[in-house]
UniProtKB/Swiss-Prot annotation:
Binding positions (substrate): G78, I152, M173, E174
Species, as recorded: Salmonella schwarzengrund (strain CVM19633)
Catalysed reactions listed for this entry: S-adenosyl-L-homocysteine + H2O = S-(5-deoxy-D-ribos-5-yl)-L-homocysteine + adenine; S-methyl-5'-thioadenosine + H2O = 5-(methylsulfanyl)-D-ribose + adenine; 5'-deoxyadenosine + H2O = 5-deoxy-D-ribose + adenine
Keywords on record: Amino-acid biosynthesis, Hydrolase, Methionine biosynthesis
Lineage: Bacteria, Pseudomonadati, Pseudomonadota, Gammaproteobacteria, Enterobacterales
Gene name as annotated: mtnN
PANTHER family according to UniProt: 5'-METHYLTHIOADENOSINE/S-ADENOSYLHOMOCYSTEINE NUCLEOSIDASE, 5'-METHYLTHIOADENOSINE_S-ADENOSYLHOMOCYSTEINE NUCLEOSIDASE
GO biological process: L-methionine salvage from methylthioadenosine; L-methionine salvage from S-adenosylmethionine; purine deoxyribonucleoside catabolic process
Active site (UniProt): E12 (proton acceptor), D197 (proton donor)
Protein name per its UniProtKB record: 5'-methylthioadenosine/S-adenosylhomocysteine nucleosidase
Record GO cellular component, one term: cytosol
Amino-acid biosynthesis found in the keyword field: yes
Record's signal peptide: none
Subunit organization: Homodimer.
Pathway where it operates: Amino-acid biosynthesis; L-methionine biosynthesis via salvage pathway; S-methyl-5-thio-alpha-D-ribose 1-phosphate from S-methyl-5'-thioadenosine (hydrolase route): step 1/2
């Protein structure tokens, strides 16, 4: 099995990258892909860049060039569920765009023409992630993750997301674009991110302060998940 891992920022991939043996670097389309073995398992780690276009471009290049069997999207996210705090884990059961609106033509809010309203994560990957969470004794929430090209740190943006997606557990800027590409390629995916901030008016301050905490937690989760997927 070859496992594809996608993170947007240097801070979100550096700990994992340092653990890859026999590492080689591929630069394509402004993205960097690091291939090798993570604890004996073949991996391809993508640093995509921030935002939906960068994530979709990177995911496409990763899938075409490295042919992974599954995709794990890792990194940080803003917490929406009331039980979440910095360092906690969110696992996707679905991903949707929070900034797409073609409802004038009868589509659901967040749905693009020719696409489902949401992109479902793979049940087996979800189950494996939840098993890792129990083993590591981490606090985690599974649910809807929403994505858009905006960092949410104000009451207006937050209120709009809560109104349109009352069940969303986290918000970030890449996951749904990655899920969209995986849907088109028919490749299983799951989003496993750590909370770096609570999506409120001070989130930009807590994000800078706690990004390292989120990166450490998400790296721990992904490393454990890779082991479980490879060896059961």
């Amino acid at each position: 099995m070859k496992i594809g891992i996608i993170g947007a920022m240097e801070e979100e991939v550096t700990l994992l990258r340092d653990k890859i043996d026999n590492r080689q670097t591929i630069t394509l389309g402004g993205c960097e892909i690091y291939t090798g073995q993570l604890n004996g398992t073949e991996v391809a780690l993508l640093k995509s860049g921030i935002g939906k276009v960068a994530a979709a471009l990177g995911a496409t290049l990763l899938l075409e060039h490295c042919k992974p069997d599954v995709i794990i999207n890792t990194g940080s996210a803003g917490g929406l569920a009331s039980t979440l705090k910095v360092g906690d884990i969110v696992v996707s059961d679905e991903a949707r765009y929070h900034d797409a609106d073609v409802t004038a033509f009868g589509y659901e809010y967040g749905q693009l023409p020719g696409c489902p309203a949401g992109f479902k994560a793979d049940d087996k990957l979800i189950a494996a992630a939840e098993s890792c969470i129990r083993e590591l004794n981490l606090n985690a929430v599974r649910g809807l993750i929403v994505s858009g090209d905006a960092f949410i740190n104000g009451s207006v943006g937050l209120a709009k997301i809560r109104h349109n997606f009352p069940d969303a557990v986290a918000v970030e800027m890449e996951a749904t674009a990655i899920a969209h590409v995986c849907y088109n390629f028919n490749v299983p995916f799951v989003v496993v991110r750590a909370i770096s901030d609570v999506a409120d008016q001070q989130s930009h301050l807590s994000f800078d302060e706690f990004l390292a905490v989120a990166a450490k937690q998400s790296t721990l989760m992904v490393e454990t998940l890779v082991q479980k997927l490879a060896h059961g």
